[in-house]
Amino acid sequence: YEKWFKKLGSGWGAAPSVQIIVDNSLIVMSANHIYKLDLNTGDILQTGDMVAATNFGYTPPTYADGMIFAPLADGRVQAFNAETLESLWVYQDTLKGQSLSPITYSDGYIYTGFWNAETKDANYVCIPVTDEDPTNAQEAKEAAWQYTSLGGFYWAGSVVRGDYVVFGTDDGTSGSDGTGHVLSLNKKTGEVMDSVDVIGDQRSTIAYDKETDRLYFTTKGGYLYSLKLKSDGTFDKDTLKTLNLYDDVDGFNNAAGLLADK
């Protein structure tokens, strides 16, 4: 059963992005445009112009504080008014790169990372969201801080816990068994509070489970990890648990146990 469909462009470069729902409307990016569609009919309600296309379309926009933040090619993030889809500002990263990491919002700032290549540097950044120059639709935004890492950041969505933001890095090699890192930084200053080594590129959003008070994440090397973050922003490394999903023939059952373990 197909209720409606809407063609937004042609060719793989215009493939629709992952969508989000904002105020009972569907937000989707395609080619160099961002659209607001009616959920029931698919009619285009608003259209906004983006300064670049997305990278493959699988990193969705993020909504927060009345704004939509679009991850775009060449290390760009563009902010839009969520009601009108008018552009508010544009961030251009100093090292550029593909915008492949989900955008996280917390207390007036967004956090995201970029990727250039397996063995090249890229930045993870904290960007203030305030529209400081409402007269300039493409106001050039600057990062509050940036963290540079060899190998960059790929699917590396962050989680904010209190005053700290936690995210992971690639391992800086072309294989899958190098040493990546999961980092805890002061979310306002970018000061590194702690780091834990992981096997392979850390390529997942960091998840937090309130019941177990644990962080969970995976790596390209085939590992599932779990550990706790202390109130001072350092990791409780005595709580670190690791599961090799490739080698463990009973991996799914053990993963369930790891997820349930407090």
For each feature predicted by the language model, list its residue ranges.
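Repeat-blade elements of multi-bladed beta-propeller folds
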Residues: 6-35, 52-78, 98-125, 146-182, ...
